[in-house]
Amino acid sequence: MNDVSSAPSESLTEYFPEDLLHVVRENQPLRETLWLGIGGPARFLAEPVEIDQIEKLYTAAREKQLALRVLGQGSNVLVREAGFDGLVIKLSAPATSGLEIQGQKLVAGAGAKLTHAVIKTVGEGLGGLEHLVGIPGSIGAAVVGNVSAEGRDIGSVVESIEIIDEEGKRKTLTGDEAGFAHRQSTLMGTVVLSVTFNLEPKDVSALTKRMQKLWIHRGQRRPSESNRIAMPFIDPDSISACELINSTGLAGIREGDVSLDSAAPHYLIAHENATSDQCVKLIGRVREQVLMQTGIDLQLNLQIW
């Protein structure tokens, strides 16, 4: 984000100290940064260029009782039409999205793309993340949600996580302290700054072949008719969300201008003129029907702001 050239509004100066005004803007649209491409604006949107600024933003939000959210790649976020009445911190600057190899470890900024991290580590002959290639989202979101694929979750290779905790204190947690479980962790409510992964040296050629095979497979399953997509549900322990939705006859179900893909129903598609309200209604209908027919309570992968 470029510095704001005009004088800051009274609202900005009321909520944020002077040394943050150049990284915060008011009433900013979010839809351009979200995969679904719908929803209203953020009351305040900040794009910090230094880690210290994130700490100061967090402190300002706490002091002014502003709701706060962190935005990475926007692949699992749905914003309602009314927008988000609070502060959104977008992690897009190099200081928050870098990738650095240190021996057999990867130090990744929370805003870095997960797939970029996979490609970098595979190229360095380091195994442990290659099975996650093609999964959308940022490192921070992937770790908070303990994303998994091929029977292995990302938490299994996390050595440490640098965070700002719920009290605004910067600290480093071990992987064990993050409370990793099936598609969850105890990191929700914190701001993840960076993650260190402990990986295993492996043959570059073998890793590359495995990564390419998985990438092609996932690309073939992704809906081709639309780029405005999201995966709204977490796979239950015993069955994938795709299989579960197919088994209940809900593939292709539609609510206004929003639908589940007919071939890969774990994908939600926002067609032209789609709204966030339609997304919420469709998700609710699917969860209700799946619960009635199978007894399984589908949990949300999508964050609704």
From Swiss-Prot:
It catalyses: UDP-N-acetyl-alpha-D-muramate + NADP(+) = UDP-N-acetyl-3-O-(1-carboxyvinyl)-alpha-D-glucosamine + NADPH + H(+). The gene is murB. The lineage of its organism: Bacteria, Pseudomonadati, Planctomycetota, Planctomycetia, Pirellulales. This is UDP-N-acetylenolpyruvoylglucosamine reductase. Keywords: Cell cycle, Cell division, Cell shape, Cell wall biogenesis/degradation, Cytoplasm, FAD, Flavoprotein, NADP, Oxidoreductase, Peptidoglycan synthesis. Residues 37-202 form the FAD-binding PCMH-type domain. It holds the Pfam family FAD_binding_4. HAMAP family: MurB. GO terms for cellular component: cytosol. Belongs to the MurB family.
